[in-house]
Amino acid sequence: MSGQVPRVPEEMFKEVKYYAVGDLDPQVIQLLKAGKAKEVSYNALASHIISEDGDNPEVGEAREVFDLPVVKPSWVILSVQCGALLPVNGFSPESCQIFFGITACLSQVSPEDRSALWAMLTFHGGGCQLNLNRKCTHLVVPEPKGEKYECALRRASIKIVTPDWVLDCISEKTRKDEALYHPRLIVYEEEEEEEEEEEGAGNEEPDSPNEGSTDGKSSPASSQEGSPSGEPPFSPKSSAEKSKGELMFDDSSDSSPEKQERNLNWTPAEVPQLAAAKRRLPPGKEPGLINLCANVPPVPGGILPPEVRGSLLAPGQSLQGPERPEVMAAWSPAMRTLRNITNNADIQQMSSRPSNVAHILQSLSAPTKTLEQQVNHSQQGPASAVLLGQVKVAPEPAPAPQPILHLQPQQLLQLQQQHLAQQPYPPPPPHPFPPPPAHPHQFPQPPLQRPQPPLQQQQLSHLQQQQLQHLQRLQQMQPTPTAQLPGPPAQALQPPPPQAQAQPPLFGHDPAVEIPEEGFLLGCVFAIADYPEQMSDKQLLATWKRIIQAHGGAVDPTFSSRCTHLLCESQVSGLFAQAMKERKRCITAHWLNTVLKKKKLVPPHRALHFPVAFPPGGKPCSQHIISVTGFVDNDRDDLKLMAYLAGAKYTGYLCRSNTVLICREPTGLKYEKAKEWRIPCVNAQWLGDILLGNFEALRQTQYGRYTAFGLQDPFAPTPQLVLSLLDAWRVPLKVSSELLMGVRLPPKPKQNEVTNVQPSSKRARIEDIPPPTKKLTPELTPFVLFTGFEPVQVQQYIKKLYILGGEVAESAQKCTHLIASKVTRTVKFLTAISVVKHIVTPEWLEECFKCQKFVDEQNYLLRDAEAEVLFSFSLEESLRRAHASPLFKAKYFYITPGICPSLSTMKAIVECAGGKVLSRQPSFRKLMEHKQNKSLSEIVLISCENDLHLCREYFARGIDVHNAEFVLTGVLTQTLDYESYKFN
């Protein structure tokens, strides 16, 4: 900077709250203060991060986690010179920019073109100057002549390029090979060359290769159109205009205003989904249970290099399911299970799912319990068809028409699939798959072409040995698959129809027999494998059976020749091999969910409908951190489940730690950022193929098969991988007339009885509530919440409460009485315990109604000996502590975005207990400042397994990070346990 400080317009930086990383030039600080900028000592409060060092960890977390703009000090200087705040996009110090580390000398270009090139280079992280000296890395010159050119030729450290190199790098968003843009490669037409010789001298600046240190001063992008200097490759004015137009368009789409980009890197997976789920529920209905996040394994090691990543198949957690309530009732293995008590069901929900993957077999919520009552009592109406929480799915928007660019790989992919499907034993394809084995059920083995660490070799060898034994059994036992029908020639020039397969058709029931919708499982006899071993509560298996029987099916306790279907998770088991030998239909609980929604026995048609090709606990994607874009509702949930089954971590946000982005379309902010950060972008088939045994796909993220987007059904399985699994579906399931005549299903409700079906809303409808007979003063009016009851029971309680003059509390903060029959880990219970005066049983309300006044609560306080033993606490003591002082008073919490239960739920629980939740991640410096200064509030870090990559710096510096139980169990027991729930 020059010694003279430029005049700063008054209040120019008034809206800027800056956080300085590293040492800044004192004059930059002076300019900021003169413009009324405010320095903050905590980066979460900043609007701008100012730093020269783009590799500083604080800069990385500001961009990746908080999505804050990070600028170089030159942004301040040039903003002052221009008299206005410049866009932050062109001032990033980070090394991910196209021209980072480049200092270019511009020579022999017109002033207009020089301004344009200067702007392009500096905007994308480079530097420009007019003098050729030791600082220069590139010489930008349109012709192979001049003193600077001759000097640069003698220096191997200086690369010589034409201006086209700058334009092409920007248009393709990557640094191009300079050797292809050397000016001597240009071929000139003679006439134009002569014109150029006449004009060139006037446009060329002095060609002095001196070693002076003058750096050309930076300037903001010029708004003028660049005028040509005469050289053909760069000179046409239309070309310059076009390039600049594309540049501005690309930049605006890349780094549009902060408010648009703010949702990219810090997108809590849970918060919007919870809101969306509530929108799909009937008015007033709440999600049944909190999915209290589960496994808390040790902090994983660093991400392995690409050649090793994904090939480790580590035994570990059992395979589990998706986030929103999705199938029947939760099962869980015992892997340091986080303790959990359910709310309005006697069935205990055990949560050992990862934070972003809720239970595929979730505890039955009120609608499904209604189904059980219908099954048991027959007077209610037909059994509900949905085991999965009965969330009404909003129609998914149809994908936009694909441009020709994307149609071509899609057509090629379909042609390849059609051609391969026509051959009983397809020849080795030239792309993703290794040569198919002779036996149609065999799956490709994980490749061993690259050296593996000893632990990975051992685990991989163990998996291969299991698969080999499994495949040998299949070779001995499996019948020859039915002959395949000839198909159209593979040389067809048009893609086949979506459902055109060279296979015999697939059937559910015999098409000639009409099956009643209520009994769509007639003739199906299920045996269940894999799942029972993972169910901590054996009552859940009985629930499955009741639901299957309610739709005409049957469940046998053991596998027998009578069985038609095997419900299983993995293809690697003796029971699965026996079922395949006997040509039984082998499907998953996810398929059962699908047919329950459709009320029709349809063949499996998604990758999740088939058992996985590795043993339970096998994790082919254990080193992957996956994010998705373009998928909504059920499709997004399916991808979460697929990621979990494959052993990958799932994040709802995208940051540089992600290893794969699964896209529906090659569009959107996440996609653009993934390309910028060189994160592979694949379609959903990539993950489906891995689940079904094509482990070679782990190293094929760049193959055309997995980068063809806009597929009609991205979740459809690859035909070659499921040929044998679909074999049993080529024969229709026959249902005898005796079975059709003899079946008795729950009767349909009569038309006049429909209105009497109990409402699902926990709040009584306004018209059902009588006006209060007593009017109490606000101080004497109880504000009540109910938790753990059936909706119809809650409605009756609310009527009595209103008659007595009480009110239903709008929120836990305004609640004075919580009515519950037992201790439950619901949102209401865990928020109310910190603020209510009394937690009482329903008998208190009954006694009040009997006496027609509110009676003393002491004789009706809730006592739950079982829960108090389980959690080693006293509810009475917890309430006493909460009344004495809020548990989290004077404490700040930072909770990572992928936490489970959702961020909004955790925030409500923390705030009711007196704490505050920070919206942005605190820096190490800020944490140490709060830790060492006792007058500052303590900052507690809460995370989950899927977000541990966001906490690497904390672990490296020995800072404790806790799981959600620090909060959940903490508020229940009203204690702070800093040891039991921290990640090691």
From Swiss-Prot:
SMART domains the UniProt entry points to: BRCT
InterPro entries reported in the protein's UniProt record: BRCT_dom, BRCT_dom_sf, DDR_Transcriptional_Reg
One cellular-component annotation, GO: nucleus
Entry keyword Repeat: yes
Signal peptide start-end: none
Region (Interaction with TP53BP1) location: 505-984
Source species, domain of life: Eukaryota
Domain BRCT: start-end pairs: 8-93, 94-183, 516-609, 616-704, 781-862, 883-924
Residue window of motif Nuclear localization signal: 583-600
Gene3D superfamilies referenced in this protein's UniProt entry, alphabetically: BRCT domain (3.40.50.10190)
Pro residues compositional bias, start-end: 424-454, 486-499
Ranges of compositional bias, category Polar residues: 752-761
Keyword check for Transcription regulation: yes
Single GO biological process annotation from the record: DNA repair
Residues with Phosphoserine modification: 227, 235
Classification via SUPFAM superfamilies: BRCT domain (SSF52113)
UniProt domain comment: The BRCT 1 and 2 domains mediate the interaction with PAGR1A. The BRCT 5 and 6 domains mediate the association with the MLL2/MLL3 complex. The BRCT 5 and 6 domains function as a single module and are necessary and sufficient for in vitro phospho-specific binding (substrates phosphorylated by the kinases ataxia telangiectasia-mutated (ATM), ataxia telangiectasia and RAD3-related (ATR) in response to gamma irradiation). In contrast, in vivo two pairs of BRCT domains (3-6) bind to phosphorylated TP53BP1 much more efficiently.
General function of this protein: Involved in DNA damage response and in transcriptional regulation through histone methyltransferase (HMT) complexes. Plays a role in early development. In DNA damage response is required for cell survival after ionizing radiation. In vitro shown to be involved in the homologous recombination mechanism for the repair of double-strand breaks (DSBs). Its localization to DNA damage foci requires RNF8 and UBE2N.
Subunit annotation: Interacts with the C-terminal transactivation domain of PAX2. Forms a constitutive complex with PAGR1 independently of the MLL2/MLL3 complex. Interacts with TP53BP1 (when phosphorylated at the N-terminus by ATM). Interacts with HLTF. Component of the KMT2 family MLL2/MLL3 complex (also named ASCOM complex), at least composed of the HMTs KMT2D and/or KMT2C, the common subunits ASH2L, RBBP5, WDR5 and DPY30, and the complex type-specific subunits PAXIP1/PTIP, PAGR1, NCOA6 and KDM6A; required for the association of PAGR1 with the MLL2/MLL3 complex.
Name of the protein in its database record: PAX-interacting protein 1
Source organism: Bos taurus (Bovine)
Record gene name: PAXIP1
